[in-house]
Swiss-Prot record:
Keywords: Carbohydrate metabolism, Lyase. The active site is at residues 83, 111. It comes from Burkholderia lata (strain ATCC 17760 / DSM 23089 / LMG 22485 / NCIMB 9086 / R18194 / 383). It is an enzyme of class 4 (lyase). It comes from the Bacteria. Homodimer. This is N-acetylmuramic acid 6-phosphate etherase. InterPro entries: Etherase_MurQ, Glucokinase_regulatory_CS, MURQ/GCKR, SIS_dom, SIS_dom_sf.
Length: 301
């Protein structure tokens, strides 16, 4: 499909007089347009669920999650990948983001190269068993199309995230996540509604994949990495809430657990030492809920 025919490139009748509006009215217009994006993303939930399953299965088997895109789309994937290690304790390199031309994306022309998409995946050590998520608002960015083709040829599972329905990217993917965001307030500026939709989708793909892998207990980030005072206080609060103990008890357990909330919670809930908690976690694939379910009621603290 030619660029000028894409929904994301069409003029938005609601904002035809954008430059004549006062600041409050212009902001209200943008807010109204943005407000409908979550409902549009909701139509793609079945496809997003399929994507989560693919990602969780790959990570469980030792594969990686690789986001790849150009411009704003690529930066959204890069930022989502960047947050996974401190939030969920993923291993370095387990979830990565690749942006055409690097994060700064100074040379916009690189998105026109399908060869560069393949080369960047190879430079990242693409291997069978990885999952590649191609992010492209238009659904036709050559850099992303080349990356998806190469990933598919390598034997990787592929997911396309696009903001135009019936896209070329979708045809190259095992899972096609397409959201019709409608025309942008600023014609063709897909960093706006399309970017918001892509951010929502990436949030769901990574977060619910981590939930499926046992990286949470309830809605608590039990693998959060403790790198500063704020995160330490947060980790203490997580242990306190999960184990139902005062914060001073939670703090001592966290120290004994080597600053790992998951282990501290198991120590307190199962009444075991650090080594015992680590064994419980390993036997349950890291899931606190599954680990506690293996204990007799009388052994739970």
């Amino acid at each position: 499909m030619h660029l000028e025919h894409l929904v994301t490139e069409q003029p938005n009748g609601q904002s035809a007089n954008l430059d004549a509006l006062g600041i409050p009215d212009a902001l209200a217009l943008m807010n109204r347009e943005d407000a409908g994006i979550a409902a549009r993303v909701a139509h793609a939930l079945p496809a997003i669920a399929s994507g989560v399953t693919v990602i969780a299965d790959a990570l469980r088997a030792g594969g990686r999650l690789i986001y790849i895109g150009a411009g704003n789309s690529g930066r959204i994937g890069y930022l989502d990948a960047l947050e996974c290690q401190p939030t969920f304790g993923t291993q370095p390199g387990e979830i990565i983001g690749i942006v055409a031309g690097g994060f700064a994306g100074i040379t916009e022309s690189v998105e026109d190269s399908d060869t560069l998409g393949r080369q960047d995946l190879d430079a990242a050590g693409l291997a069978r068993g990885d999952v590649v998520v191609g992010l492209t608002a238009s659904g036709r960015t050559p850099y992303v199309l080349g990356a998806l083709r190469h990933a598919r040829d390598t034997g990787c599972r592929t997911i396309a995230v696009a903001c135009n329905v019936g896209s070329e990217a979708a045809a190259l993917a095992d899972v096609a996540i397409e959201v019709d965001c409608g025309p942008e307030v600023l014609t063709g500026s897909t960093r706006l509604k399309a970017g918001t939709a892509q951010k929502m989708i990436c949030n769901m793909l990574s977060t619910i994949s981590m939930v499926a892998l046992g990286k949470t207990y309830g809605n608590l980030m039990v693998d959060v990495q403790v790198h500063n005072h704020k995160l330490r206080r947060r980790a203490i609060g997580i242990v306190s809430q999960a184990a139902g103990v005062p914060t001073d008890v939670a703090e001592r357990a966290l120290e004994q657990a080597g600053d790992r909330p998951r282990i501290a919670i198991l120590m307190l809930c199962a009444g075991v030492d650090r080594a015992g908690a680590e064994r419980l976690a390993d036997a349950a694939g890291g899931s606190i809920r599954k680990a506690l379910a293996t204990l007799a009621p009388s052994t739970r603290a």
